[in-house]
């Protein structure tokens, strides 16, 4: 309706021109202009409807708006994705044959896959104790095996609710899985103060993909805290995939100041459900890196 009114207004404004010698050309131009606007409006509406049709859940809270969207429902390619603005926080194929597949930043050739395929505890088929700061949709839980223990630390309760309701990584985890709500560093500090050293074989820090960087997780004191919760040969994995910042330099500097060895693992996606990823491996176990 608004477009039609705008078109009529334009016709009135140009009515004086209709008396000129170029009347036919003016009329033809106006008709073409109106058709172009109507066509653009049609495609814009179609785009808006299509983009909204895939969103199956939306939550708004202190940390912003979270959306769960899906595509190809009812097929083997049925995919659900958790996003915060432009940032993807994980996805999952929902068909039974593929739902345990780790995508986005956690695929076989990502830093996560490399770690689990080469960690001594996994190589010798011993149970692993795993910590993860930042839940996402719980994709890392798909890497757990029977006998493993995996504990997630998540600051946003809404993320935990969406991960548990719309994704199955936590429910389908082969190991024992738990989710602790609250700031990851503060929770780790409280555990240490209570004498609850977690003795992790691997600790993943997965909280830096958004626009706002939780700097308190990147300090020397934070890294010292992480390694107090890791076994002597344990591995710290820091996810630094970010659209705006390259955190590899600061992380390497902090790690080296604490006498640790580092390795940057970058992975280019090989499938459409994978994402480009960058992980920094930090460890005292020199043999694991070299």
Which residue ranges define each predicted feature?
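Alpha-helical transmembrane segments of multi-pass membrane proteins
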Residues: 1-290
């Amino acid at each position: 309706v608004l477009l039609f009114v705008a078109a009529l207004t334009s016709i009135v404004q140009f009515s004086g021109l209709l008396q000129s010698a170029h009347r036919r050309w003016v009329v033809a131009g106006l008709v073409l202009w109106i058709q172009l606007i109507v066509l653009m409006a049609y495609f814009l509406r179609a785009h808006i409807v299509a983009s909204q049709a895939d969103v199956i859940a939306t939550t708004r809270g202190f940390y912003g708006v979270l959306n769960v969207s899906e595509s190809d429902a009812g097929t083997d390619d049925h995919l659900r994705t958790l996003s915060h603005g432009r940032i993807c926080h994980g996805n999952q194929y929902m068909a039974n044959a593929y739902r345990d597949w780790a995508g986005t930043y956690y695929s076989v050739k990502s830093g996560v896959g490399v770690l689990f395929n080469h960690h001594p505890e996994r190589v010798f088929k011993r149970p692993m104790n795993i910590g993860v700061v930042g839940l996402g949709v719980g994709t890392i839980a798909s890497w757990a095996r029977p006998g493993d223990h995996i504990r997630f630390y998540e600051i946003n309760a809404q993320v935990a609710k969406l991960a548990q309701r719309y994704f199955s990584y936590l429910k389908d985890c082969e190991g024992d899985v738990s989710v602790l709500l609250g700031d990851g560093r503060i929770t780790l500090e409280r555990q240490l103060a209570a004498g609850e050293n977690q003795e992790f074989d691997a600790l993943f820090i997965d909280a830096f993909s958004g626009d706002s960087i939780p700097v308190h997780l990147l300090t020397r004191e934070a890294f010292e805290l992480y390694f107090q919760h890791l076994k002597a040969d344990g591995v710290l994995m820091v996810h630094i995939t970010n659209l705006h910042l390259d955190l590899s330099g600061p992380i390497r500097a902090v790690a080296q100041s604490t006498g640790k060895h580092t390795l940057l693992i970058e992975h280019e996606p090989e499938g459409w459900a994978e994402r480009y990823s960058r992980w920094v491996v930090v460890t005292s176990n020199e043999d694991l890196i070299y």
